[in-house]
Amino acid sequence: MKPLRAADVRRAVDAAGRAITAALDMRHKPIVSDMLNSAGSVSAEWYIETLWHYLAKRALLAGVSSFDVEFRQPARLADKQIHFSLPHPEADDLVMDFHVMRVPPGAKKSEKVPVARIAIHRGTRRRRHGVAPEPPAHPYGIEVRTRHLNAARQVSWYTLVAVIMDVARRGAQFADDRIDREDDTLLYIVPRFTFTPLVDAALRDNLFVYPEFAMAQRWAKGRTSSTARVTFWAVANAAPWPIAESVVTVVRTSLVNGVRRPVDENGDVVSKSGA
């Protein structure tokens, strides 16, 4: 047996250290019904609330300018547990990866299946895209109560993202000509979105928050997706101010031969290159 060289020992120790660090930086949560959206998968707002919790715990919130969320597979109740890494550096961003463990058909052992990824962009400034419009004079909104707050007594990202997802999907649906055609299996889904928290809205008397919807990219012939922009405003006893902005990709889907697929305005499946 050959004697171990110092370089080999260092490499082995480094590899073991990386493995231990990765294991310590992983967390898991049981998937329960309160975490699910109307489609039966883990909701966008749950991912964002989890992100906020660990950023706040590590005192990293002040350095966050915006983040991108990409959903890769729906995580469902049958998956039982969702696993995720704590925010860690990757290139110029912080990243959180989420996965579940599933047994593939015909296999005996479970395998790791990525379900979501959040890229957190760091910077000292948070700003909106383009010129800020005049605040809309909406007669509706959410009166902020304790249940809408995070641990810092500010309107939570969970509250904002939950409403943003509903408003973006429904607004894009109403803007789609396809909705006028009979299709009981039509469903609008969100594969990715960006979120920019502009300012924190702390609890105060008579505080309301409300969303403003606009189409950033309208439905086009032969395409399966559109883009919505949702701006969240807060108002108390003075002029409204924007507190968050999100750009949301919305995909039109339908059941085709028993499989949910992106479809164009005629209900036909479109290749990825044409989507």
Summary of predicted features, one role per range:
Residues K2-D68, R72-Q73, E111-R192, A244, ...:
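Hot-dog-fold acyl-thioester-processing enzymes
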